[in-house]
């Protein structure tokens, strides 16, 4: 497999746009969770990252990078769909939190693998610039979205606002998956 850099840049842009869009919703989503959950989540996150780091000799290849990237993106898609279907509850907050923790377990691996497979300084620079542009745009869109639904549509309830932004997150996440798949090509 090989990375198609132009499409990969769009994937990274959209991925960071999602992060910018979603960042404010986490605080409302996680409201039902007990603070001790975050402590245990941190312990499991550290253990998971340790386990992944010990697997580098097996998974630091482009095929594993592609599959793990897909796993992360589909995990996020599942969390969004679950929230949209089952709304707010302790179980929903916990499932979404665990989903995010699962994706974070692979964070260091994905950054290291991405750096290895991009190879060139210019490609790495372009990816980082695309990520920052996506993140900034996502935060601006998120801010605008919340302002519009609060002041133009009169929706003042934070839970309803966060529920609505999840439809944008759903479209964003589906676009991310499509672009991720398009970013890789099998070598002939």
What are these regions (language model features)?
Residues 8-20, 24, 28, 99-146:
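Substrate-agnostic recognition of the 12-TM MFS/MFS-like secondary transporter fold
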Residues 73-94:
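C-terminal ends and interior cores of transmembrane alpha-helices
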Residues 30-41, 87-96:
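Membrane-helix interface and helix-disruption motif detector
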Residues 40-57:
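Central cavity-lining transmembrane alpha-helices of secondary-active solute carriers
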Residues 143, 147-174:
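A membrane-interface helix-boundary motif in multi-pass transporters
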């Amino acid at each position: 497999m090989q990375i198609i850099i132009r499409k990969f840049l769009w994937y990274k842009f959209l991925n960071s746009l999602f992060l910018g869009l979603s960042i404010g919703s986490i605080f409302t989503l996680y409201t039902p969770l007990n603070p001790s959950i975050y402590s245990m989540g941190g312990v499991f996150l550290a253990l998971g990252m340790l386990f992944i780091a010990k697997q580098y000799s097996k998974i630091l290849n482009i095929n594993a990078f592609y599959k793990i990237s897909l796993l992360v993106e589909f995990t996020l898609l599942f969390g969004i769909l679950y929230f949209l279907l089952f709304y707010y509850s302790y179980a929903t907050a916990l499932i979404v939190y665990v989903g995010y923790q699962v994706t974070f377990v692979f964070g260091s691996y994905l950054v290291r693998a991405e750096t290895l497979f991009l190879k060139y300084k210019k490609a790495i620079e372009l990816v980082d610039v695309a990520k920052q542009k996506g993140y900034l745009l996502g935060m601006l869109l998120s801010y605008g979205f919340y302002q519009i639904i609060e002041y133009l549509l009169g929706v003042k309830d934070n839970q309803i606002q966060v529920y609505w932004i999840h439809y944008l997150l759903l479209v964003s996440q589906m676009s991310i998956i499509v672009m991720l798949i398009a970013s890789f090509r099998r070598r002939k």
